[in-house]
Design a protein with these regions (language model features):
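Active-site neighborhoods and metal-handling regions in enzymes and metal-associated proteins
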Residues: 1-162
Length: 162
């Protein structure tokens, strides 16, 4: 299911934040507990069709969750797609990382996830803002095909656009 892809993307992000000293502890535990959502307060992607957010008026439970229970955990509850991917599906993959001062202040004040978040180090990044990478994919019989050109991801690739 796509929820597993979301969890893996969150774990990869946590590992990167650990390298910067912003997070600590076991990445899988941090994601399970919801500590990653300080930086990743949204889902990983959604299905596309005739419209960008196709069929959302029907309700996410019936489109992206097929009637299964949806998480109520902050961050995870914003994931719009949890069903197994099938050939022919078109969906977005849009991981991101944000530093939201109000959310940082709230969680720090509540001493939330102190075992996973180094709030002193987070303060150094509080005015960074955020970034989100969005690419669209077609699910095929053998995997997935990116729709459109590869976007620059590394600092070197981004700087080369100048």
């Amino acid at each position: 299911p796509y929820m597993k892809v979301y969890e893996l993307s969150a774990q990869v992000m946590v590992e990167g934040l650990k390298e910067l000293g912003l997070m600590k502890g076991n990445a899988e535990d941090a994601v399970r507990e919801g500590a990653h959502a300080l930086f990743y307060p949204h889902g990983l992607g959604h299905m596309m069709g005739l419209d960008v957010h196709d069929m959302e008026n029907l309700g996410e439970l019936w489109v992206g969750y097929d009637g299964q229970p949806k998480s109520t955990q902050f961050g995870r509850k914003s994931q719009r797609l949890a069903i197994p991917l099938e050939p022919g599906f078109v969906h977005t993959v849009e991981p991101g990382i944000y530093f939201i001062p109000e959310l940082i202040d709230l969680w720090k004040g509540e001493k939330k996830f102190m075992d996973f978040i180094n709030y002193d180090k987070v303060e150094e990044y509080r005015n960074f803002g955020g970034i989100r990478n969005e690419e669209d994919y077609l699910i095929t019989e053998t995997g997935a095909r990116r729709l459109g050109k590869k976007i620059p991801l590394t600092p070197e690739e981004v700087e080369a656009l100048r």
